[in-house]
Amino acid sequence: MKKILIIVSILLVSIVLGAIGFTTFQYNTFTPVAVMQDADSKNLVYFQNSYDECRKNFILSANKINKKFQKVTISKLKIESKKDPDLTINYCYVPAQKKSKRLLILSSGVHGIEGYVGSAVQQMFMEDLLVNMNLSEMGVLLIHGMNPYGFKYNRRVTENNVDLNRNCSNDIKLYKSINAGYSDLYTMLNPKGEVSLKSVKNMFFQVNAIQKIIQYSMGTLRQAILQGQYQYPEGLYFGGNELEPSIRAITPVLKQIAKNYAVVFNIDLHTGYGARGTLHLFPNPINDKKLKNDLETIFSGNHIDWGDGDDFYTVTGDFTSYIGRIIPKQYYIPMVFEFGTLDSQTTMGSIRSLHNMIVENQGFHHNYKTEKDETKINKGVLEMYYPSSENWKSKAIEDAKIILSKSMKQFQSIER
């Protein structure tokens, strides 16, 4: 009997070690599916590699629009900062040329580092689409770099470590809410001390993550982690204790412009989540039947991920929902464009994305063990939100151009 127990124990240990070895190999060799469509050089001209250059080119494109339409407003909002005196949200507003019926709001950079791609899409929209659009009854508001600090310093969050897309609320109750699921995972999500990629915890991060998936399920974990939390100021996905300066600054602009229109349609541009090389249409769950039907009309022929399946999650304090709450008299249509980068809809892609976020946040708050760790971590995060692949960049612009061109025509038919 003793011999049998020893054999069984050896087998169990072998199975466990084999599983750890297999998942470690899978994790360490994971790469997202490559975009095979060749890059078009015409699409690449819209990309720049710094906040300052993106802002400069956004303004240049806006100035061209100013020559095409009447009463165009090109302006900026200075965002208060203890670190940098030159952080601005820039915007271009083209009013409906004859009768104000519908307004499009195309916003970018809510998650700072995602602003590179958002800026490129906005530049393309102005250069290739807006100049040829009929704006007799439709106005357009382009908001560039909603989180200029995160954009400039390659962070997803603001200077106060606030996730701007978890911060937006006109109800103080949000900032006092408790995400119990997040608290249960706090130690895993927010490790202390200098970050070292060679530590056992980081080298075998996927083992801990898979254990949590088995314990809670992927859907439950994803929701608990990503929906937002308001208890831990240095933690991931912190939504803040009050409205961030960026949101306070843009709110009166949104109210002032939107009040002239019966129908307001917001597209907020993001990168990161989902299949690499795919443009996902990703709103929060919608119960209003007319609103859902109108979105399906606007994006006819395109798949909409309604945020109510196992692969997706909902958030609290998001920017698109906030706009609707501050303009209650308007018929408001929200949508999020998410350009997938790391195949985060897969288990390994999701784990890699989370690990990237954890070590970047740990390094920012507690420093890095070595310069090599710092360089590798920051490079990985930038790649996750702004892929270096020219094929990926070109396809992102092409997909955006096709969908925006079609949806703008469909939007013209929407009535309150």
Q: Which stretches of residues belong to each language-model region?
A:
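Structured catalytic-domain cores with a bias toward divalent-metal coordination
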Residues: 2-416
